[in-house]
Regions:
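FIC/Doc superfamily catalytic core
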Residues: 1-139, 143-206
C-alpha cells in the first residue's frame, strides 16, 4: 500500500526533490506564476501516496467534489470553500503584479544586493502566508506554500532556503498561525532567519 499523504516517507521526499528541480528551471526562465502552477505541484507532491480521497488531489476547495471541504489550523479556520476561487483569483493578480515589479527590480542573472533581498523576502513571505491563509487544498497547503517561497527565491537569485520536509522549526509554526489571521510579517521574520542560517551552513563563497 502506498504511504499516507501526510507521512514523511521516502516517496514524498522523492516527489518534493524532483519537483523542486523542475521549479528551479521554471524560476530561471522566469515563467509567469499562476494558481494552476500550484495545482500541478500539489498533484505531483501526492504522486504514489495514499490520499484520504483521490478527488482531493489536484482540486481546489469549492470545486466539484470539494464544495464543502473546510479546514483549520489549531482551530483557526481558513477561507470558506465557496470563497476559495475568488481568493485565488486575487492572490494570482497580486502575485503577478509583485513579480512584474521584481522582474525589473532584479535583472536576470544578477546577484541581489541587500535592498533587493529584503524585497524578495517580503514577497516570498507574503505569497507563502497568503497561500496558508486561503488553504486552497484539502491537504498539502504547507508544502505548496513553501514551494511558492522557494520558487520566488530562486527566480531572483536566492537559494531554496525554506525546508520542504520536515516542516521548518523555530518561529515557523507561530508564523503560520499569524498568517491564518492575515499577518505575514512573522513569516518574513522567520524567512530572514532561515536564509541567514542556510547561507551560514553553506559557508563563504570561494
Amino acid at each position: 500500500m502506498p504511504p499516507d499523504w501526510d507521512t514523511d516517507s521516502p516517496e514524498l521526499r522523492q516527489n518534493l526533490a524532483g519537483l523542486l528541480e523542475s521549479i528551479k528551471q521554471d524560476a530561471r526562465q522566469r515563467k509567469q506564476p499562476t494558481v494552476e502552477t500550484a495545482r500541478r505541484w500539489q498533484s505531483e507532491i501526492m504522486r504514489n501516496l495514499q490520499a484520504d480521497d483521490p478527488k482531493y488531489v489536484g482540486a481546489f476547495r469549492g470545486e466539484t467534489g470539494s464544495e464543502d471541504v473546510q479546514v483549520h489550523v489549531n482551530w483557526i479556520f481558513d477561507v470558506a470553500a465557496p470563497e476559495v476561487g475568488d481568493a485565488l483569483g486575487e492572490f494570482e493578480q497580486r502575485l503577478k503584479s509583485a513579480v512584474a515589479y521584481l522582474d525589473n527590480f532584479v535583472p536576470p542573472g544578477a546577484e541581489p544586493n541587500a535592498d533587493q533581498i529584503a524585497v524578495i523576502i517580503d514577497v516570498c513571505a507574503w505569497a507563502h502566508a497568503e497561500w496558508v491563509r486561503i488553504h486552497p487544498f484539502a491537504n498539502g497547503n504547507g508544502r505548496t506554500a513553501r514551494l511558492w517561497a522557494n520558487s520566488l527565491a530562486m527566480r531572483y537569485g536566492l537559494p531554496p532556503f525554506v525546508g520542504l520536509r520536515p516542516r521548518p522549526k523555530g518561529g515557523y509554526e507561530l508564523a503560520g498561525e499569524k498568517a491564518m489571521r492575515g499577518d505575514w510579517a512573522p513569516t518574513a521574520a522567520a524567512f530572514r532567519q532561515m536564509l541567514d542560517e542556510f547561507q551560514n551552513e553553506l559557508g563563504p563563497a570561494t
